[in-house]
């Protein structure tokens, strides 16, 4: 298979590129380095099965890029991922996450792409749902422009599927963590805790520590992307998580144990817009894709901490 991965220099995207290459596929990676890092791909410099294109999905001539490389499947991970930035600047968020997605879909349908695998957001699109773990049948109720843009991307791609025959599926991950996650900013709390504790800096928990999330390891998420790239799950959204809730306080304890550091976070007022709970029902992915998470939280946290420990000592 010849695949194109947008957002290829990002945390999840670069891990997906590695997996596809390991499986024997050829990969074209595309990224504008807005949040992705060249260091995530530098180990592929001499890999003849990998080509990298520096481009922005909002401004690049995507038709020319896809015409040149002729991918069979496009994995669409490029996105504006900062929820708070989406609240402050919804127009920019929509330009990337909605218009960028439509531009990619238009180029894909014109150049013979078989399928787009789109990245949605299981951690945000359901808002405060009526049940936990939350299934795909729950109504979407975006609480941010970021979440609204992810839902809009799903709708547009499903419309392209019905109108033009461009197949698509949607991966809706819970809270993804693992090596290469960005430890800066406000997202990626496992990486943030790990980096701070390894550096001897204070850690912060927003609220009283009882907010919960469903933490899923990046390798498990990448496995779901690979599975759905086949001729399965057309037009469907697949929740990709663990079905287990972990509180902020429990997560801090797990990271502190892996680091061997103090389990004594500072507690700060809750942040506007933060959900109280999030946990995904993964039954559809189990039934249709044969997918289940393989990495338990303690093991995944340990692997993540070791990655940052190695970086910290370099």
From Swiss-Prot:
Enzyme class: isomerase
Documented EC number(s): 5.1.3.2
Gene Ontology molecular function: any one: UDP-glucose 4-epimerase activity
Record's keyword terms, sorted: Carbohydrate metabolism, Galactose metabolism, Isomerase, NAD
InterPro entries (UniProt xref): Epimerase_deHydtase, NAD(P)-bd_dom_sf
Record-annotated active site: 146 (proton acceptor)
Pathway noted in the entry: Carbohydrate metabolism; galactose metabolism
Gene3D superfamilies (UniProt xref): NAD(P)-binding Rossmann-like Domain (3.40.50.720), UDP-galactose 4-epimerase, domain 1 (3.90.25.10)
Residue sites binding substrate per the record: 121, 146, 175, 189-190, 204-206, 213, 271-274
Cofactors demanded by this protein: NAD(+)
Binding site for NAD(+): 11-12, 31-36, 56-57, 77-81, 146, 150
Domain of life: Bacteria
Protein function: Involved in the metabolism of galactose. Catalyzes the conversion of UDP-galactose (UDP-Gal) to UDP-glucose (UDP-Glc) through a mechanism involving the transient reduction of NAD.
Family stated for the protein in its record: Belongs to the NAD(P)-dependent epimerase/dehydratase family.
Description of how the protein assembles with itself and partners: Homodimer.
PANTHER family referenced in this protein's UniProt entry, alphabetically: DTDP-D-GLUCOSE 4,6-DEHYDRATASE-RELATED (PTHR43000)
The name this protein goes by in its record: UDP-glucose 4-epimerase
